[in-house]
Amino acid sequence: DLAAEKLQEFAGVRRRFDLIGEAGGVTVVDDYAHHPTEIAATIKAAKALDFNRVHVLFQPHRYSRVALFSDEFGSAFDEADTVTFMDVYSAGEAPVPGVTGKTFLNVVTDHGHPHAVFVPRRIDVVPHMLEVAEPGDLVITMGAGDVTAIAPQLVDELGR
């Protein structure tokens, strides 16, 4: 029947804690989480694994979502050892004045997270993560935008 045929074709869930690679003793995974509940659940699952520290590189998705859920994002990153925010991936939306990746930084630091930073320039993201991650750590690239492209770049640089 058609349902069974389609199930056979299903390739599985992509961008849910996908292992991208390991280099220099650092493991890098990629995850699509972009809503506060998904973010918290992904970080909680990562913390249950055997890593020294969990670093989240998060790219906010859509200006409207940032504005709508900004308060809920405050606690979503609580269990991460460090959080690095990129600028917003617009997904075709027009920018909203005053809403940037720094909006997330402010919400999370106001909520009490001691190790959160905003890296506004994409070119600076991989060098920043190289400074933060150490052998035995896990880095999660997270978000619904093009942050997924950073994960293999990070693995390449960690391996040099």
Residue ranges and their predicted role:
Residues 85, 156-160:
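Short, flexible loop segments at boundaries between secondary-structure elements
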